[in-house]
């Protein structure tokens, strides 16, 4: 056998050894297609349409039966930040309990069955006021029912900022609303809202608000709100006045 014949015979055996495997190719193609289809489906299911998600999240948040919260309001006056209020509270079916500081005064207030119970900071005793009209005033609206600050007439300039990973994964958005809250609308303008929306339940659990004073634009308002324990059964009871 000549050298060329030996080479030809060896090449033939090599070709048979590495025969093209169509089954493997088909499997690879199918896996690629399924992977791509899964990715497309995932993106479709998790797609975010800000103009639809934001009003839905606001509606779901403002319609809860109960919640707990932390809220802080700061005023910016001549470049300096001044604390207006910092309270924590809980609210259920129109009844509430809040504790903290408002306008430099320590407060501990419970509102149950149209009665306001206010704890005296000096004696520690509870005083009762029949009729809760004082807490219908605009001054206390944010501290008493902070989700009311989410109510709006229009939502403008909605900007989706993406997903923020954390203890609670959240959709993050910014927008400029036309607010209906009387306290906010009376004294402030040029509102800028930033919200964190629970990815799972589509409710707002964190809110940040900036606004300019109507008469003195260089002065501003900064509000921070944390919401949690949505629709939990809360135990808000009247304290002993003895």
Task: Please state what every model-predicted region is.
Residues 81-86, 103-108, 112-113, 187-193, ...:
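Short, surface-exposed coil-to-beta transition loops
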Residues 88-143:
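An acidic-aromatic
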Residues 47, 119-185:
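Flexible, processing/modification-adjacent segments and terminal tails
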Residues 2-95, 232-242:
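N-terminal leader/targeting segments and the immediate start of mature chains
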Residues 64-66, 93, 104, 111, ...:
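Extracytoplasmic
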